[in-house]
Amino acid sequence: MDLGINHNADFTKWVVSAGLLTEPFVLIDVGVQGGENIRWRPLGDHLVVHGFDPIEEIVQQLTEENRGRSNRHYYCMAVGNADGEQAFYFNPVNPSESSMYERRADQSDKNASEQVRTVPIRRLDSLLAEGLVPKADFVKIDVEGFEKDVLLGAPKLLRAGAVGMETETNFGVSPAYPKSHFGTLAELALENHFLVFDIAFNRVPRESFQRALVHKGLKPISKLDSLGSPATVNVLFGRDLIDEVDHQSNYQNPCRPFSVSQLIKSIIVCELYSLNDVALDTAERFADRLGAHLDVDRAVRLLADPDCVTNEYRRQIRAFELSTSWRITAPLRWAKMLVFGAPAEASKSVDS
C-alpha cells in the first residue's frame, strides 16, 4: 500500500555526492512511529528529520537508536490545531492504532484495550514561530484520522517553503469529515497549491462477503489488494511548479516564488517517489535556472530511468526467474502441469 519508492534515485545520489544540494532537506514527520521511510536514505546526512509522536515509548526508542546523530530530532507530543494538552487513546496491543479519537463503541475488537493518556499538543506554526522547528521541505502525516487538525495548525509552515506532503487518508465520511476525509485534506492541500501527485491504497472486502466465502467452504480473502472498496489510502501531494508558472490563473490565491534550492528539492521528491517523468519534465522546463547550478543534460539522463518504479520484490522475482536453476527446471514444471493439471486455486472459477 506504500507509495512508490525509487531504489535507484540516481539524480538524488548525484546532487548529494557532488555537493549540488547546498542546504539540508528538512522532513517533518508527524506520526513518526517506526522512524522515517527508507525512501529518504539517498539524501544521506543532508536529511534533517523532526519527528513527532505522542507515544513516549516510541520517541524514547527512536532517540536512543539515533543517539549521536545531530540531524535527527524526536519530540514526544501530539501535533494538531491547538497548543496545550489533550487526551490521547493509546492502544498497547497495537500502538499503530492509537489515536487522538476514542475508539467507537461499535468496534468490537477483543484485542483492543485503550489507555487514556494526557499528552502535550502543539501547532506546527507555533513551533515554527518559536524556532523549535525550521522551515520544512516536506511534511508526512499519519495520525489515525487527526490529519485535518495537523493541517489546520500548519498553514504558515506549509507556505514557508514546503514542496510536498504525504498523508494517510480514506474516502469515508463522518461528523468530523462531512466532505469525506480525502475531500477535506485535498481542499486544505490545494489552499497551499499542493496537487495530488500519486495515490496508493489497499482493498478490504466486507465482512458479510468473507463470512459467505467461509460458509461456502472457501477461504476468506487475505490479500488486501484483490477485492473490495479502497480502504486505507496514502496520497502524495506536491507543488506543480510548471503549472504554477504557466497557469497562475488556475489558482485562487497568488503563486509563491520558489528558489533554485526548492526547485532541486522538488525534483528530488518526485524522483524518490518514483515520479521520474515529473522530475525530468521539471528539470527541462527550468533548465535556464538550473543550468547555473548543475549539468541539466546529465540530470535529464539520470532521471530518464524506466526502472524507477520497479518494485523491489518484483525485481527479486524477475532475477530468480532469469536464474539458471529456474530455467533448467522449467521443463519439469511444464511436465508436472501436463500430468497433474494446473493448481486447483488457479483454475477454480468464481462461479464454482
Kindly label every feature range from the protein language model.
Residues M1-A319, A330-D351:
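Phosphate/nucleotide-binding beta-alpha loop and adjacent structural elements of enzyme active sites
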